[in-house]
Amino acid sequence: MKTPSSLIERRALLGLAAGAALTPALPLRAQDMARPSAQTGLEVHPLWPNGAPGGEQVTAQEQVILRTPSGDPNDTAYLHIRDPWLAVRRPARPNGAAILMIPGGGYQRVAVSKAGGSIDAGLADLGFTVFVMNYRLPADGWAAGPDVSLQDAQRAIRMVRARATDLGFDPARVAVAGFSAGGHVAGRLATAFDRDAYRPIDVIDQLPTRPDAAGLMFPVVTMMEPYAHAVSARALLGSTPSSAQRDAYSVERHLPSNAPPLFLAAAADDRVVAAENSLLLWQACRVQNLPCELHIFEKGGHGLAEVSTAAGPSWMRLLNIFLTRER
């Protein structure tokens, strides 16, 4: 029988994957907004102090929804994001490293809360300073189109490094952790750092965008058939993308020789995003002799919730070993 803590862990893991299956959710009601927040000291900062770039044609209004009817008011997802942000969770015992965490949502929404959750809390318990990113979505009319989420990710990792001194971590020990479609955003951040996705706006944009390591959990990786996740591919590239577009946004096809070490975790029984996404990226790293660690669990589904214990997700323990390993 699952303990209460493992049930909470399962909900959090499924939340990180939310949007891949896209179950219905209800708008936040006034009484929900009035309920106490679970937030305990998380700082929230806008990514773009003067507004996100390229929004002249954006008309959709940002929404916050509950992921389940009458559920936890902090278990939310964002749609039509116009003002992306970073929420910061500080560890009690810092280990000198930071993680930029990118949740999923099938590129149709972002399953994230300003209150944080058990995953960022678990990473902080391991000593990481954790930055949780909310990001813009490609179908909302932004000028950058399918690169809009990459713009936010590049800006976010620069903002993370800009906080290194005052938060007490090494700017050369900044990893990215992405989940589901957020894994695709993280994968692009880890492979497309040789070009700026946006024009610099301040001195922060002089900082590098290459993460020092990347963890991709049950990730969307490829846009190529037969393993592309249809929901993410359609939201990212439209209903009739060309072969060239599919190729351009397939992470495994654009690995630079100086890609950071990659950690991949997926379940063989994932019926939402095929584990072959992770296999394709591992094989591509193997061809180039790039550092990459792959874990395929027999069971776990999309979210790897079934391979969690009362002590936390199995992938988190393995990721911690990977990120703290001497290289």
Can you say where each PLM-predicted feature lies in the sequence?
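C-terminal catalytic histidine-bearing segment of alpha/beta-hydrolase fold enzymes
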Residues: 279-327
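Short beta-strand/loop motif that positions the catalytic acidic residue
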Residues: 264-266
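N-terminal secretory signal peptides and thylakoid transit peptides that target proteins
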Residues: 1-24
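Primarily recognizes the serine-hydrolase "nucleophile elbow" in alpha/beta-hydrolase
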Residues: 158-228
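Conserved alpha/beta-hydrolase "acid-adjacent" motif
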Residues: 272-277
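Mobile cap/lid helix-loop segments that gate and shape the active-site cleft of serine hydrolases
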Residues: 65-73, 203, 219-254, 260, ...
